Amino acid sequence: MSDIKKVVLAYSGGLDTSVILKWLQDEYQCEVVTFTADIGQGEEVEPARQKAVSLGIKPENIFIEDLREEFVRDFVYPMFRANTIYEGEYLLGTSIARPLIAKRQIEIANQVGADAVSHGATGKGNDQVRFELGYYALKPDVKVIAPWREWDLLSREKLLAYAETHGIDISKKKNGGSPYSMDANLLHISYEGTVLEDPAQEPEEDMWLWSVSPENAPDQAEYVELEYRKGDIVAVNGQALSPAGVLTELNRLGNKHGIGRLDIVENRYVGMKSRGCYETPGGTIMLKAHRAIESITLDREVAHLKDELMPKYAQLIYTGYWWSPERAMLQQMIDASQATVNGWVRLKLYKGNVIVVGRESKTDSLFDPTIATFDEDGGAYNHADAAGFIRLNALRMRIAANARNKRG
């Protein structure tokens, strides 16, 4: 018998977590509470309730919650204020969802008096780290059960056999479905496994579930205008929208125009390289637009400092340190920089491309056309000042050149 009496399981209703649910009941002889988060994965979450009930979970121990607004408002938006991108390409769609799920799991554990939490992340991936760092940051004494590190069900065939033996409904899996390991939320959908494990193999077109291919996107470009307030999008084409509403609309536009597909090999935190394919249509549009509005509203040195800090900030999110003090410190700096990031950006969407065609800030623009003009500026900029500026900046290089010449 285990000393664990009650565990909160992050539960999707799929094969893996349904097997985990039954395994927890059998191996730990404990009460299981299920938590299913709707973060915009694009499929019904209510079936998870019926699945949990069929596996013996009491109705009062089933938590299904719509977290889409919180996800975008408190996690996606703060991340995009930093123009966050991991290893030059990845927009962190999976990584940024884990802190919210971990947070809510711990809150439910405190609410129901659970002494443990559990997840379905494998022992090879980053998600086990992300979930568990979150758990410990928010509840230091919590017990964590990671079945993939304990059991011997280390293949899909063994999971299916266990499910059949224990009466777990697997009809959806047996009747087909995608061969890929997928993860989806309002920001992105990811694909891993099977043929993608050969990084030289191009994925089949029918793998991509969200977007049309750029080749098949409309031949007519579409324009979209985004309004920013303190670094966050508050309206699309003049229509005020909630954070989740903004991302939903940008996903629609991006999918229509073949925007946001990505095929990369990334360096996992656990040490291996992994090939993944991603569709992040709305996020791709957001990143381009945010950099555009910052280009006229941020001081040069502030913008450059943000760019220097961004890789570290991205690494913290990718590796699971959202709840760390260093991420919180960086977030305060990033958020402070956004006070003047107000205005609008106009974009042209065309066959996989996001093209900035206009930006304006009536209140906070640092772009002064009277100084930047190539025409007569009426004395706003004194060309002669450049000579001293250049000589002073060249001084150290002139000294170094003189030293080299003396050495022969």
Swiss-Prot record:
SUPFAM superfamilies: Adenine nucleotide alpha hydrolases-like, Argininosuccinate synthetase, C-terminal domain. GO terms for biological process: argininosuccinate metabolic process; L-arginine biosynthetic process; urea cycle. Pathway: Amino-acid biosynthesis; L-arginine biosynthesis; L-arginine from L-ornithine and carbamoyl phosphate: step 2/3. L-aspartate binds at T122, N126, D127. PANTHER family: ARGININOSUCCINATE SYNTHASE. Homotetramer. This is Argininosuccinate synthase. The lineage of its organism: Bacteria, Pseudomonadati, Pseudomonadota, Betaproteobacteria, Neisseriales. The gene is argG.
